A protein has these predicted regions:
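Long, charged, low-complexity intrinsically disordered regions
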Residues: 1-86
């Protein structure tokens, strides 16, 4: 189910490079432009992969670590670019 939150705890790091872009594209399709990606605090491996992937996606307007109430450095908040209306 696509609800704007992607929890990566159950995924292997090698899956994340394909999973994150696919999930974000599906979010855009249904009008979700603010997404939370939960990568966990741990050693930072998943966070690094997620941030690397996000920095390469042209449809990502902005991303940052979440605030304390949203998962702190265990989650990243992503804002997707909106499609301009003609």
């Amino acid at each position: 189910m696509i609800n704007g939150t992607l929890d990566l705890h159950t995924f292997h790091p090698s899956d994340v490079k394909a999973l994150v872009p696919d999930y974000l594209i599906e979010c855009k399709k249904i009008g979700i432009y603010d997404v939370r990606i939960i990568h966990g605090k741990g050693t930072g491996v998943l966070r690094g992969i997620v941030h690397s992937v996000l920095s390469e996606l042209s449809y990502v307007a902005h991303f940052q670590l979440a605030g304390e109430s949203e998962g702190a450095w265990g989650a990243t908040l992503v804002t997707l670019k909106r499609i301009a209306s003609p």
